[in-house]
Amino acid sequence: TVAKVVTYKMEHPEVEVINTITPIREEAEITSNTCVKVVTNGQDDGIYLSRSPIPYPKKGQDITYMKHLGLYGLSRKALLFFASAERTKLEQIEDIEMLRFVENHVNIKFVTVDSATIAVDRPEDIARVEAAMKKKLEQ
């Protein structure tokens, strides 16, 4: 996963912000407010990130939700911008720091990786990680 971000940066040195996403595999994550969902355009540019299920399939379309992994590749310029810029309105509402870039028109390129991850945001998440580790050790 890290190698994919590094490779992308080397192939596209002009990109200031790189981030990673992966398909959501567990249905519960779609509605979980601890799982950040990402919508990109056809060129893998970030359009929006939310704790809500996005995009919303109004007509029941079958879609693949993508989740934010939080592995960033930032240029020095992007890092300095982030450190000096005020938290934005949507960033405060959603509590997602990448929205600071979105609201300030700084493009985020998302690299899709095949990585099953478990977010640890609440004490009850620890049991899920322990179960996954135990299962992996038993293989």
Describe each model-derived feature in a short phrase.
Residues 1-85:
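Conserved core of the sugar-phosphate nucleotidyltransferase
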Residues 58, 63-139:
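Conserved alpha/beta core of the MobA/IspD/sugar-nucleotide pyrophosphorylase nucleotidyltransferase superfamily
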